[in-house]
Amino acid sequence: LHISPSVNLKFSKDAYLIVEGSLTAIGGEANIITFKAMSDSWKGIYVLNANNKSHLKNVSISNITALEDGLLTLTGGVTFYKSDADFENVKISDIKAEDVINIVESNFSLKSVFINNTNSDAIDSDFSKGEVLDSEFLNIGGDALDFSGSDVSIKQIKASNVKDKAVSAGEKSTLNI
């Protein structure tokens, strides 16, 4: 799925975006791409089983609740499952899900990511490999960065008003900070 610069996507309360494949949303500095709710909230983004890498650049995402729909239940507001992803200059705010971004069994790069106002964890990486660079986490209800079985490099992050831990690592994770 390719989304053009300046596109402003508004989702209804029970709506969500599922992409079986890669997601490319590359905006410009002056013409960002926006994913937001029509009213209070929407159920987020789920990218799965992509053969090609997803790219999100100059993107704003807001007002997500957890995705629960019948048999489909996800902990992340934005979830990448077996789908490599690069995020650059992405702002995510006002998320009411267990994880803002949940990356599972994927390679990733998060550069200049700003996450604000969450009720739980900001980034949750499960059995993945990647990097978090030049990013900021503000008003986080759980951990800013939570790693399980992951191999991650972390450089120049700022975490403020984090309720639990700035960085949490378990299940044989390897971190380079």
Where are these regions (language model features)?
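Beta-strand/loop edge motif enriched in small/polar residues
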Residues: 1-177
